[in-house]
Regions:
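Short acidic low-complexity segments
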Residues: 34-45
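Short active-site oxyanion
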Residues: 7-10, 46-48, 143-144, 189-193, ...
């Protein structure tokens, strides 16, 4: 978005120096974004340094920025500057489902010719084109901004959107008590809160949100403003009816799983909060293609279907396994933990999810956790 607004953008990264994912860096260069080694040489006076949570103080670019006295922002602080504007903004939070919901809302608005700006954590297939192969962000009208927001580092406390959406709350990067506090404050800061009432944790938080600003949705929650009924799950999608007041619309999805039906119901509620009609929102989702690495079928050979999925916490794994279990065949699961830190926090719960979700003839393979460098404690690995 900054580059599209005529701002100058440059950057570095460990992956660039290591020669990984060169096609992604080539794409950035094609947008006019300058790239340089992460050795401090690219840092110049007048720059603002924006860093992700993984960038440590010892990184040469950070050292150079400090020596030059440059303004420094974390990625969430920079996103908050864009999101906390007096304009229609919608932020999607929650432990699971926020990337999919953000993609669904973005697509609904686009299909209704609203031209949103969308910031997501995954590639949205509907927006992929030859000139934009990595469509995890869409630059549109700066006056309509939809973004996924993350709670893993506590930075969700920075955001003050017009509309805050909460999908669910479960164990992930932080303890439950802290998550309840972070998400509750997130909803209360917004003018309107869109909340999944089927999730016990989010429902409890919704009870403290003023009734006139809370928009509830759910399949099993009487009193929800957006109610899902007649849910039919199929191998390649689902169908249900959404009821909102005196209106009702049938919804057809081509992404599988009960969790995605819930995601779609929430996306409809959020889009309607932005002024989209129920009919338009439901109709647009029939053409939603999904996200990369979210139960994405890579191909089939010799009777074996290969599926790529990003599930990395107990809740996500439960949903993925439940969706796969509903289809015939044995499961051969290769699961790489999302990092040494998350494995240390959730190892027992992850083991329980697999123990309960896999059948006797299924197989689970565990390589070492993801590690891209840094000083994280690595004494416990996948041999847990």
């Amino acid at each position: 978005r900054v580059r599209a607004s005529s701002g100058r953008v440059a950057g570095s990264g460990r992956s660039l120096d290591a020669g990984r994912t060169q096609h992604k860096f080539d794409y950035l260069r094609s947008l006019g974004i300058a790239l340089f080694p992460q050795d401090g040489s690219g840092i110049q006076p007048g720059m603002t340094l924006v860093t992700s949570a993984a960038v440590e103080e010892s990184v040469p670019d950070v050292v150079s920025a400090n020596e030059l006295g440059l303004e420094r922002l974390t990625r969430p602080q920079f996103l908050a500057k864009l999101l906390n504007q007096p304009q229609p903004t919608l932020a999607v939070g929650g432990t699971s489902g926020k990337s999919t919901v953000t993609g669904m809302i973005g697509w609904i608005l686009h299909a209704c010719h609203r031209q949103p700006t969308v910031m997501n954590g995954a590639v949205m297939k509907n927006f992929v084109t030859p000139s934009a192969p990595f469509a995890s962000a869409v630059v549109g009208d700066p006056e309509l901004f939809v973004s996924e927001v993350d709670e893993s580092d506590g930075s969700i406390a920075l955001y003050r959107p017009e509309i805050a959406m909460l999908t669910n709350i479960s164990l992930d990067h932080k303890e439950m008590a802290e998550l309840r506090s972070l998400f509750g404050a997130f909803l209360l800061r917004a003018r309107k809160a869109v909340v999944n009432l089927d999730d016990p944790e989010t429902r409890a938080i919704a009870d403290v949100v003023p009734a006139d600003k809370c928009v509830g949705y759910g399949f099993d929650s009487p009193g929800a403003r957006f109610m899902g009924k007649n849910l039919e799950l199929m191998a390649d999608g689902s169908a249900f009816t959404v009821i909102a007041g005196d209106e009702s619309q049938d919804v057809q999805l081509s992404v599988a799983g009960r969790h995605n039906a819930s995601n779609a119901l929430g996306a409809i509620a959020a889009a309607c909060a932005l002024g989209v009609s129920l009919e338009e929102a439901a109709g647009a989702l029939a053409r939603f293609e999904g996200l990369r690495r979210r139960l994405e079928t890579i191909g089939t050979a010799a009777g074996v279907t290969v599926i790529d999925d990003f599930a990395h916490n107990p809740d996500k794994i439960d949903a993925t396994l439940a969706t796969l279990r509903a289809q015939p065949g044995r499961l051969l699961i290769m699961f790489q933990p999302h990092g040494y830190g998350p494995l240390a926090k959730m190892g027992d719960e992850l083991a329980q999810s697999f123990a309960e979700g896999l059948a006797a003839d299924d197989r689970l393979y565990l390589p070492d956790p993801v590690y891209q460098g840094g000083t994280v404690e690595r004494s416990r690995g996948s041999d847990w």
